[in-house]
């Protein structure tokens, strides 16, 4: 990345995307302070050049000199925001305001903030995307009035290792994996024709590291594959039973990265098919080992005269 060691703050650094970013930064020899209350993300990277503040972003007080902030902490998911609009908007806006003000006072030269690909699609249709659009308005104010250099990172249905796998925080890919693992049918809301621009976490992180080394950093950084896939096609790749349920309101029909900053190496359909093949092999091996243990136990009893 660079021969110079920098000091980074990563809010939400225990989450899915955040933990991968922290890991990548440390692998490049950088120092990282993670601010995360660990209510959602639980992953900690155990290396000497990472320190943790287990506090709410809005109340944390970082100590030290920092070169850049990655503000990834947020209340995620459109569906969650429908049941708690006040909490979503308040948390997402307040945390961004606090971090932006800290960056202004500390004169931190680089500020990267996570936004949502849905922010460009009817951003007043749900509390989550509304909160993200408010965050951008706030950062633009800080740029014009106080000279804060910020860059918006747009994520497009990120999947891969460490993806959230519980409740409404679960990604679509992980939710389908869990159904296969528990031998339950895949649940599709509506017709399954909705399209999403699924992007592997490794492609996303490679794009962020590339951004850090670039002299000309765009204001809007779209970290998507540029190849949207329908939910139905994704489900079919799992080669598993499917059930349809009533559609959920407030979600876009198509989310596409029209101007990708990265050249995605991973393809979600190929990824899913490989995962399913590996899962089937592991299940067969598990069953074989289970049967062998039964046979060994039976012969052990015979040898002992029982």
Cite the ranges covered by each PLM segment.
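NAD(P)H-binding glycine-rich loop region in Rossmannoid oxidoreductase-like domains
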Residues: 57-91, 118, 122
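Conserved Rossmann-fold NAD(P)-dependent oxidoreductase catalytic core, especially the SDR/UDP-sugar
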Residues: 71, 90, 94-129, 151
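Conserved beta-loop-beta element that borders a ligand/cofactor-binding pocket
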Residues: 115, 138-162, 187, 242
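Flexible, glycine-rich beta-alpha linker
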Residues: 119-127, 154-171
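Active-site helix of classical SDR
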Residues: 131-134
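C-terminal substrate-binding subdomain of Rossmann-fold SDR/epimerase-dehydratase oxidoreductases
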Residues: 181-306
